[in-house]
Amino acid sequence: MPKRVLTGTVVSDKTDKTVVVKVERRVKHALYGKIIKRSKKYHAHDETNEYREGETVRIEETAPMSKLKTWKVIERVDTHATPNHA
């Protein structure tokens, strides 16, 4: 079975070798039909601490590394993002 790959925005890079990535998806409301946004946060492994808050990254599912980390960052998608901290 292929590994899942998701694209999202880094919302936190405060922990060592870990980033929190927010992945948004658009779904249609079952009754009213309006398109609404749903989001979920994933803890992803960042071995070199190179990804910063605000960047768009691609993450891939891996074997569990800890209680929360079952994803790893593959690559940076958007290089023009400006980090929120100095």
Curated annotation (Swiss-Prot):
Q: Which GO terms describe its molecular function?
A: rRNA binding; structural constituent of ribosome
Keyword entries, A-Z:
Ribonucleoprotein, Ribosomal protein, RNA-binding, rRNA-binding
**Stored Gene3D superfamilies:** Nucleic acid-binding proteins
Which range is the signal sequence, renumbered to this chain?
A: none
Give the SUPFAM superfamilies listed for this entry. Nucleic acid-binding proteins (SSF50249)
Supply the CDD domains for this chain. Answer: Ribosomal_uS17 (cd00364)
| Highest taxon, organism lineage | Bacteria
Q: Could you tell me which InterPro entries the record lists for this protein? A: NA-bd_OB-fold, Ribosomal_uS17, Ribosomal_uS17_bact/chlr
Entry function: One of the primary rRNA binding proteins, it binds specifically to the 5'-end of 16S ribosomal RNA.
This protein's assembly is summarised as: Part of the 30S ribosomal subunit.
The entry's protein name is Small ribosomal subunit protein uS17
Q: Which organism is it from?
A: Rhizorhabdus wittichii (strain DSM 6014 / CCUG 31198 / JCM 15750 / NBRC 105917 / EY 4224 / RW1) (Sphingomonas wittichii)
